[in-house]
Amino acid sequence: MTGLFVGSTDAYGGKSLICIVLGLKLKRDGRNVGYFKPLGLLPARIEEQTVDEDAAFIRDVLELPDPLADLSPVLVTEELYRRAMTKRAGLNLADRIKEAYARLAQGREVVLVGGVGAVPTTGRAFGLEARRLADLLDCRALLVGKYESERSIDGILVSRDALGERLVGLVLNDVPADQLTFVREEMVPYLEDVGIKVFGALPHDPVLRSVSVGELADHLHAQVLCCPEQREQLVEHFIVGAMNVESALRYFRRMPNKAVVTGGDRSDIQLAALETASKCVVLTGDLRPSSQVVTRSQELRIPLLLTREDTLTIVDRIEWLLGRVRIREQAKIERATELAQEHLDFEALLRELGL
């Protein structure tokens, strides 16, 4: 059995995305693949248990039969950090992880082990940072490096040093289109010169960085005034509608797959947003829209999200959400699979793993 730990240079760097697309490829190839997330950071109530939300989602995507309790045996909470800091006995985290992994790995050819947070740091308080987990489970390690700028090289090198000989190679993620040539012609050769094998670079993609209308409504604690069946629609761009209606119409028409954020008293901007194929309209200030706006949104099946906060606060909360985008919707999974098939050399990775 081969175990592959998937970690990243930063939180929200693309670990789950890589686990999903690699897991689906292995299943298409007829391999018996499993998924394991030793540390969970997203507690959620599922099937009357408190489990890691990411682990439960990936289990469903890969159609795995394993019990949720085994998929992510340790949930990282504030209480766990307090217990670690006060050196209270009885944590036994490494034993719990190793025992759950042994049960899950039985009969499997490959187990993908999802990391959390950033490779060099997350889990250190418990002695369960990425390298320690890879050693504990005897896994090779694949690093996902989210590209921010040329300085991203520093985080990659620090993570390389942390993983040591466990590292099998690197996948670069979220590379802007205008940086792809630099990455392929300069950054990748440099990384390979310093001993890091690169299996490809995924370009930035607006679908993968989008959020669903439902996710947006939940995060903003918004009341969905109409069209709740459109919660799965994906929003790629956000526009604050603070201009006059003529300028708004010109601007809105140039921006596809958008959400417009505007005051609840701006019926003119709301109607302009509805008439230019927006994915939703976010109304701020707890001001309900006019009956004309509600009727038109129902006719066009475009949700209206009513929020209590002012526009500036809502924009801040949306920006926070955009920095923590997760793969949840089927459209994102399909797009990620397409990009991986085009830009990643998974065959080379599997050869490195002896598969």
Predicted regions and their residues:
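Non-catalytic interface/targeting segments
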Residues: 115, 201-262, 319-355
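Fold-independent oxyanion-binding glycine-rich loops
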Residues: 8-9, 38-39, 71-74, 114-117, ...
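Flexible, charged surface loops at secondary-structure boundaries
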Residues: 104-107, 249-258, 273-277
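Phosphate-binding/switch loop-helix module in NTP-utilizing enzymes
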Residues: 82-125, 131-135
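Structural motif
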Residues: 3-4, 32-34, 56, 109-112, ...
